[in-house]
């Protein structure tokens, strides 16, 4: 449970549309009336007002202090898998934040490390949903190593490496499995792999536990389009891309029960 004698410090991120901005401003006013403190630099709680894209933005803005910051979402967008609240519940949420100790739920993250042929400094990223790897042009050809052993040579459009919470995003559209976020794992899913008499891939999603590392090694020296959640990055002279379950975790503030499978049902099946 999160609550100390010191006033809770909060920040709000908004989708930027009129409805979200008005809701965010109203929440800020109400919470300040409860003597909570607003600080965009070092918040205890970040309130995301919008859709899943807004929460992804908030996550990357505060990914340097994940051990100190928890997130809660208010859904005003098209898809709100990460959001527990809707605008009609604004006053109920404000009172809960101001008066109720909240439970912190931690979910696994994906760590992506990109190393370069020139031996320069490596680039390291954290993903809440997924990392995708594609060639800028042509077919992606990658050697896939698991725990240091060559597993396959992949040929196709690309690869998607997702977290358990991210398994409901792009990974699901690719036919990957939905993983419960209590599982410390990542999932590797193919995008339109080439399979014929000459070339073979496993053709199935791979679920790797926390102590397994997936290493992608380019066969050809080409440029890569690599996405980390909503961020799209062009990388040249790539030697390898290492993917593993991160040591860090994302923390969500829960003011009421919202079981994962109910969240999945509400997002994809329920009317």
Curated annotation (Swiss-Prot):
Chain residues that bind NAD(+): 52-53, 129-130, 155, 157, 192
GO biological process, any: NAD metabolic process
Alphabetical UniProt keywords: ATP-binding, Cytoplasm, Kinase, NAD, NADP, Nucleotide-binding, Transferase
Residue numbers annotated as active site: 52
Obligatory cofactor(s): a divalent metal cation
EC number: 2.7.1.23
Disulfide bridges in this chain: none
Primary residence: cytoplasm
NCBIfam families referenced in this protein's UniProt entry, alphabetically: PRK04885.1
Function: Involved in the regulation of the intracellular balance of NAD and NADP, and is a key enzyme in the biosynthesis of NADP. Catalyzes specifically the phosphorylation on 2'-hydroxyl of the adenosine moiety of NAD to yield NADP.
Protein's name in the database: NAD kinase 1
